[in-house]
Amino acid sequence: MSTPHHQFESKSSTAIRRRLSSSVSSKQRPNIMTTTFASLTPMWAGVAGTLVNNNTQYEIAVTVHDGVYSTDFASVIIPVTPGDTVKNSKDIEAQVLNLIRKFSAEHLCKFLGAGITLALLKECPNLCTRLWLDMDIVPIVFNIKPFHTDSVTRPNIKHRISSTTGSYVPSGSETPTVYVEASHLGDPSHLSPNAAQKLPIPRTLDEQSDSAARKCLMYFGPNNNPRLSIGARNPVTVDAGGKIHLIDDLEEYRMTVGAGTWNAVIKLADELREKKVKIGFFSSTPQGGGVALMRHALIRFLTALDVDVAWYVPNPSPQVFRTTKNNHNILQGVAAPDLRLTQEAKDAFDAWILKNGLRWTAEGGPLAPGGVDVVFIDDPQMPGLIPLIKKVRPEVPIVYRSHIEIRNDLVHVAWSPQEEVWKYLWNNIQLADLFISHPVSKFVPSDVPTEKLALLGAATDWLDGLNKDLDPWDSPFYMGEFRPRGSHLNRGEFRSLCAKEKMHELNWPARDYIVQVARFDPSKGIPNVVDSYYKFRNLLRTRSPDMDESEHPQLLICGHGAVDDPDASIIYDQIMALVNSDPYKEYAHDIVVMRLPPSDELLNAMMANSRIALQLSTREGFEVKVSEALHTGKPVIACRTGGIPLQIQHGKSGYLTTPGEKDAVAGHFYDFYTDEALYRKMSDFARTHVSNEVGTVGNAAAWLYLAVMYSRGEKIKPNGAWINDFFREETGEPYKEGETKLPRTKLDMQG
């Protein structure tokens, strides 16, 4: 039983609570009632704890911060059992969550982040995991001392110290404690003097929690998202260099996969730790797009396993990123026919990669002698590094990972733009020891030797902000509730963004909506999405005339931008012009097109609250967004492009169509929306039939396997086989009957 030591003193307004609350029901689904609040106020917290009364009780302090100043404080004292660390940890965890939940419910607020003292984390090791998964709070850990310390210290103090090649850079020296004469303190009996017989100034628990709250706020940037952190020589210091603790409990990762995959991961990670193998990833951008998402999740997981891994990005160059995006579009065959890779662009590209590469090959850099032992290079932005690495460290194995479609039918057409770009890139890529492609037919030019070719799908993280289950309290914070224009109330993150851009709004939860989450890219088939929706609305009018149009679902097209994607604004403008032209403008008020800020939870809420998910790409890589939708139980209607057919079981978890079959897409819309039994059947199947291979843990095993084999000095010759099959065999964990995996259909990789 907890003993109140100090209760929260602020009182919530009943009038405001009544004004903000609402219950929404749907005419089509009258038994479903959703109670929401029009707005939740963003807040931050600081949490500290310490043992008291001869270690028989534990005091917990929570400070509430509104982003400007600390506004409230509470503390409780709970009994603990000396020696029973498991029970004590669970009791402390429950009290912290209860205090924060109680304040949230009474004051209609949403805690975005919480500063946690290192002393509290030691007593309650899984507290951060529970804050993240159960309450959608970003926990940031600080070594807040119980004594006052000198503020004049070297910056970038961290409580975690790792190797210079790891993802966590070393911290500075410890902040020195401030000592004073013993006579200046009231009761010095519990304090230990220093060599000069001076005593430290105690810092009370409320001061510690307040300090944690203020420090936490410093790690949030625009749109209240955690700041991206890049270190010296451009390592991406994932999770603020280890201060952000999303998942401390490895058991959470284990529960996302089957026993075979997990056992394989542990065996491979153990060998790499024992050998102290250092792994380095190199890609073009730290944020935006699927590669960056995968790398953040991968580094987070491998660091939790104590594998020495780091991820590096170059200094950005808008000029070069325009060139790399052009190259991407040319290789996929979606660029203008007259677009060419000029010699001037090649020279600028080469100079840019050389400048960045020299920083990494210089003494102390990750590619210098003594640096990483295995190099993984992502996509056609970075292959210029390969000859430089081979020159400086010829013994280091290099793996090139291609995430995009390379039109095999075009790259070998003499004098074509595709041949020109591919020859330029292949000149460097051919020096790599391994070429990894998505498992999709005709994705690899015939120049690539089959013995060097390996297959690996893309991945997503089931525990990050993009995919974790959002609590019913948190989801409306991102979605908001529909309010008439002119309302002065904060209407939730997404609605506020729509209002800011004067975009039509979703009338959720009163109305369903269909969603396509994708970058604004010429290959994503967005015009086909708009046309299919138009045809679907006409079907509802003719086949279901009794259904009021206010009950027809809306359409949401949304996605993040990427640092290296200059096309997004151009495509966005084209889509808006299309929506407002004949014949589509009739339904323009029900079509919402939004470029969203880099908030994973925002995209999560958009997908989780939708009725149906789309992916009508005309050209595609793997597109793991499909598996993300299936994982939430959303049936997916998609095109047979790239790796999409590997993820959808046609007629069971969704429908596959040929690009441009808009009437077929509209028909599937109609079936899903009017046949509840069909929808539920497919939804349940989708939720339970997603392969381990597309999750972070299964994907990580593939990278661990390659690092292990190269560390043994073995030469890998996959001959076009799946890396997942190799690591399961190597670790003695074969696939079991009935285990869900991506189909191993015969592929014609090189056309």
Curated annotation (Swiss-Prot):
It comes from the Eukaryota. The keyword Transferase applies. Its EC number is 2.4.1.231. Gene3D superfamilies: Glycogen Phosphorylase B. The keyword Cell division does not apply. Residues 1-26 form a propeptide. It catalyses: alpha,alpha-trehalose + phosphate = alpha-D-glucose + alpha-D-glucose 1-phosphate. Expressed in mycelia, stipes and pilei. Induction: By heat stress, cold stress and salt stress. InterPro entries: Glyco_trans_1 (IPR001296), Trehalose_Metab_GTase (IPR052078), TreT_GT1 (IPR049438). One of its GO terms (molecular function) is alpha,alpha-trehalose phosphorylase (configuration-retaining) activity. Optimum temperature for phosphorolysis of trehalose is 36 degrees Celsius. Stable below 30 degrees Celsius, activity decreases to 58% of maximum after 3 minutes incubation at 40 degrees Celsius. SUPFAM superfamilies: UDP-Glycosyltransferase/glycogen phosphorylase (SSF53756). Optimum pH for phosphorolysis of trehalose is 6.7. Stable between pH 6.0 and 7.0. Homodimer. Reversibly catalyzes the synthesis and degradation of trehalose from glucose and alpha-D-glucose 1-phosphate. The equilibrium lies in the direction of trehalose synthesis. This is Trehalose phosphorylase. The lineage of its organism: Eukaryota, Fungi, Dikarya, Basidiomycota, Agaricomycotina.
